[in-house]
């Protein structure tokens, strides 16, 4: 039997059975879930109604994630799935779906922040810098350009929770696209109240 999205196979509200008065139709069909995993990119195309195409991501390892408060979007590596409101099984099997909470690599965001504000981010006290990083952070600049950076530094404060994550090199993010439909795992970095909420949830789950 094929997967069907009809409702005439269900009983009536009164509990009586329904007689099927037509066969299954093409427009009622359902397909098996993609169950996208973390791994080297593998995407299948599916021909769908109206001559359109869907992109069924079976494995993905990178995505485009946006850091909302800094208006910075970068392509970065997806490391792990840590929370899913709908189903713990999807966390255990590391399945990428819309609205699941994942850990992503923070390096692209740190590099952008350091070059934009000329301030170190998520570095341990007294840690040695490589010559390139030294060049970015402690470069000699003309007065005009230095003034521009000083103006930027006034708004360079980020929350302590995010700073902790940058020190570990991983950020919590939420997937906003549908990997099994569009073949991509894009989303946004968690911040503020939303980040606090999910940190509590993850902690509670670990405590069980």
Curated annotation (Swiss-Prot):
The membrane topology term of the UniProt record is: Lipid-anchor
Q: A single Gene Ontology molecular function, please?
A: structural constituent of ribosome
Give me the Gene Ontology terms describing cellular component.
Answer: cytosolic ribosome; membrane; nucleolus; ribonucleoprotein complex
Positions of modified residues (Phosphoserine)? 160
Pfam families, alphabetically? Ribosomal_S8e
Gene Ontology biological process terms in this record: translation
The entry's family comment says: Belongs to the eukaryotic ribosomal protein eS8 family.
Q: What is this protein called?
A: Small ribosomal subunit protein eS8
